[in-house]
Amino acid sequence: MPYSEIEAKFLGPGKELTREPCYKKLKSAVDDGVFPHRGGPDSHRIQEKTKNNRLPVATINFRRRVCPGEDKTSTDVLKPLHKEMPGDKVGGTESIGSQALQDGKPLAPARDDEIYSTSKAFIGPIYKPPEKKKCRERKNETATFNNTDSKRRQEEKQKFNSKKLEIDTELSQFYKEIEELENENEASQGSCKEPEPSQEQTLSHDQACNTLKPEGESKDLSTVLQSHCGYQPYLEDESDYPCDEQLIPAFCDTSFPSFRPEWQSVHPFVIPHDPLPSFNYFNIQRFGAPLHPPPSVFHARDDARLQSGCYIDSYQDGWSCLTLDQNDEYANYDVPGNVHPFGNGYGVQDDSVKNGFCEIRECWQDPSMDMHNEADRFVNQCFQEDRLNKLQKLLILLRGLPGSGKTTLSRILLGQSRDGIVFSTDDYFHHQDGYRYNVNQLGDAHDWNQNRAKQAIDQGRSPVIIDNTNTQAWEMKPYVEMAIGKGYRVEFHEPETWWKFDPEELEKRNKHGVSRKKIAQMLDRYEFQMSISIVMNSVEPTQKSTQTPLPLQGDQRWGGSLGSHSQVSITDDY
């Protein structure tokens, strides 16, 4: 310890000096052989033996450093004592102290087994603990790690920026290539321009190729091609009605000037040279107007309705050119995959012209876009057809044997529209006192029902539902003619019941007692395939066989002509 106090006591002859800590002297104020403490904490008291058991006391100040000019009187006093007791340990101690004083150097601290010392100063480590060094090392390591991490992040950020720049460059190059391809396509499309013929010009079927204008120009339809027709169809006069970029052809004779509607055109329709398609039951059928209408045909009235994209406002009773021999090929026909159904029941193809129909198509130069354009054309055509169907008036012809469920079906269809109406030839035989059938009145009953339907069509009622058996096509021809003349759309509907062709079940379900035998005869004459073309090409039989009326009232009404028995349809229910 750097600072200590030593107190010496004489214990008697032959005893060694003992050292006590300074704190012991505080306990007793008077102690034998102990002098009052003089000096600071650095002073030591030394007691030596003498002849009278008294020791001279020399006060020695132990300091770490002793000034050279310090007073050395104490050293001179101690020298004789050293000579008298050379072997004494106290003398050794005195000699050591004297030597230390002479040299001016601090006295070395006594050993632990001889001197007990205490310190009033704080006992603790002189130097900083090693933990601080470790903390500094950790801080240095953390700083080094942070610097390394920041450098690594900067490198990653630079790599990411370089990759992003490469991707942006590739994208810009890709967009440039796409733009170049689009410009090339536009340039190739610009080579085909749509001709604009005059209003008085007529085109034959071999000149029927319309071209598509480039993008940016107007897409208005500039020409409608005319053709010579193999037979006299109805003429569809057109008016200015927008059809959402749908190409609508018109069929007319070359003796009339071409019409130029104002709606826009995008997709082509090509008229087929193959036979017309056949349709079944619920398929929608449309037909054109006669070729030579009265002069009023060219003035579209307000009640004219849009038929297959064109306004139809004409009607003519004469169908002299239509014979079964010429057009019976239309009876059975399946629509091929590349034929698009047209609005009036005809299909369209990309081949040459036949049967007096002209070909209308776009001039498309890029074969890589054919598939995409074909899909767009089909979707656009379906959407346009649905839109036209909603705008047009509707004539529904129900077909089915007695008891098959026609009346129930008519009620369902009638409930879907507020302005609809149902007509049945069988209503003629309903009286206030009940139902009375008279075969001699069968012709009058048909005329009466047709007149009612015509009045409803003239008034614009829709849908007009004809609830007759309509087993054969010629029975429906008067209704189809008057409907097409007023721009109505024509549909054929049959009840979808499992017993509709089962004579035994039909006998049980019909309300007027029609026998199973009569129902079987009607089923033998039933024409399953039905379409507009079949109806318009049908002819009423010239030879009519008569039958003797049966006694039963339910069978008596079937005793008329072969042709009329199917038209006198009973309002059946199930």
From Swiss-Prot:
Any Gene Ontology CC annotation: transcription repressor complex
Bias type Basic and acidic residues, positions: 129-141, 149-161
Gene Ontology MF terms in the entry: enzyme binding; transcription corepressor activity
Domain of life: Eukaryota
Annotated Pfam families: AAA_33
Gene3D superfamilies recorded: P-loop containing nucleotide triphosphate hydrolases
Coiled-coil spans in chain: 162-196
Annotated stretches, region: Disordered: 82-110, 127-161, 182-204, 542-574
Name of this protein: NEDD4-binding protein 2-like 2
Species: Rattus norvegicus (Rat)
